[in-house]
Amino acid sequence: MQKITVPTWAEINLDNLRFNLNNIKNLLEEDIKICGVIKADAYGHGAVEVAKLLEKEKVDYLAVARTAEGIELRQNGITLPILNLGYTPDEAFEDSIKNKITMTVYSLETAQKINEIAKSLGEKACVHVKIDSGMTRSEEHTSELQS
């Protein structure tokens, strides 16, 4: 059987992105924060280019799926806060801390490891605590946390 392939592509017009972002901002209260999720190379549209536009348009945060994506943004001059939505392996803790990438933490043990590495670097680590609120998508459960 002959396999027929159809070439596919995606194009992004940064002016349209800017227009859409500003329309969204106009619908929101002034104190609402916006996080531009640009994981997977901004879904194939070029993370650095999209991040530069979002930074210029004053979004509040950026989110990626891997440490390497956040480091690439830092290496290209992006200064916005960056949240890594994905799992950060132990060997990426130091790079995340040095590049001021907020790590998603799934367990108390991981938070403690990150804290020790940050102390040894003389830095503060930024973390985002993921809590299983009933969908069983993470290790940490609300019943295990102390107030």
Which residues make up each language-model segment?
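Hydrophobic alpha-helical segments, chiefly the membrane-spanning helices
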Residues: 145-147
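Short, basic/glycine-rich phosphate-binding loops at helix/coil junctions
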Residues: 1
